[in-house]
Amino acid sequence: MFFNRKNTNLFFKFTLLFLFLFLLKIIPFNTGFEDSIDYLNNISFTISSHFKLNKDNKLKFKSSSSCLNDTLNKYKSHLNFINSHNKAIKAKNDFIKLSDEEISSYSMLSYNEKISLLNNTNYSLEDRIHIFLGSDLENFSLVYYNISTKEKVSINENKEFKPASTYKLGLNALIYNLSLNGKLNLNDTITFENCDYEDGTGLLCSKSSIGTYTIQELLDLSIIYSDNIASNMLTRYLGGRDEVKKELYSLLNINYPYSKSTITADIEYRILMYIYDNKNLPEFNHLIEVLTKTEFHDRLDKYIPQEIVAHKIGSNESYIHDVGIIFSDSPYILVIYTNGIAYPDEKIAQISKAIYNNYN
């Protein structure tokens, strides 16, 4: 037989030599050493993604010609793929555009491979998130806005979600605006009524007697501990949730029915932008400070420095959200809303980490 052990080893040596020459041919020599390494890493990832080459894939030889032809055909096919992608690799901030078919093909990647691709900046953030989430994308909404560069990425930004506790962020923004305009005093007090009671997050629900608190105290409780009762007391004081949203949307020029019990990522982005724009005012500076002191750290700030993340989570059954301002060297706003996706906390955390690492 031609393919005895000795000849098989020779064949593999020939294949490795062929692959080495193949790589030499396609790597652009006008790039620096680090760029070449990045280029090789990208090729390596693409090969492993498309052909699933690993230790368990072993070629079974029937004849020298059939084996060689199979191998050459695979590399020829992949060479065509790489050549087309080479044309798309441009200057920084340009991306390889993936077709719907290519995005669909990446659905077969393992979770760890999807994490690697999520951090691969050769591809657009939209495509990377699409591949990472797969079919969960339809129940996901995101707005990323870089305040320094003005870059904005939106995914399903007008899709409606129950706001859960992200409602409390707009409530705080409105009350601080009313205080600045002399329409209320943050030292005014509100006394608990039975209609304010709500179980869940917060400190007040565990007290045998709740009593009276200043508006400022209730605001801080509603953010740091996501206190439902504190939020309800403030909302009642202002005339109810519809009245709060009516005033807030009027303030921000938002054209959205305030009677709806839903919100969109675009609306939350505008609320955060308003807070950031007023960050130098004492009231809003304080709001940003308490947003960095929230007790919840399993989403936006799970893998990035907590002290730079001014954020508010929201959780209501299948609705899992996190929204905030990240005060990195290049500050940005990140809004993520989800409904019924698998492992939402971790997916929000991984997307947040990828954006922080790739854009700052």
Question: Where would I find each of the regions flagged by the language model?
Answer:
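Structured C-terminal helix/loop/strand segments within mature extracytoplasmic catalytic/sensor domains
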Residues: F2-H130, G134-D136, K152, D242, ...
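Active-site-adjacent helix/loop patches that line small-molecule binding or acyl-intermediate pockets
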Residues: Y111-L125, S206-K293
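Short, conserved catalytic-motif segment at the N-terminal edge
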Residues: E138-E160
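Active-site-proximal beta-strand/loop segments in catalytic clefts of secreted hydrolases
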Residues: Y145-I147, C195, S222-S226, Y237-L238, ...
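Active-site SXXK
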Residues: K150, F161-I190, S222, L334
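Short glycine/serine- and small hydrophobic-enriched flexible loop segments
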Residues: A173-N181, R270-D277, Y356-N357
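Short, well-structured active-site flanking segments
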Residues: N177-D196, D242, L281-N285
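Short Gly/Thr-rich strand-loop-strand
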Residues: L291-I313
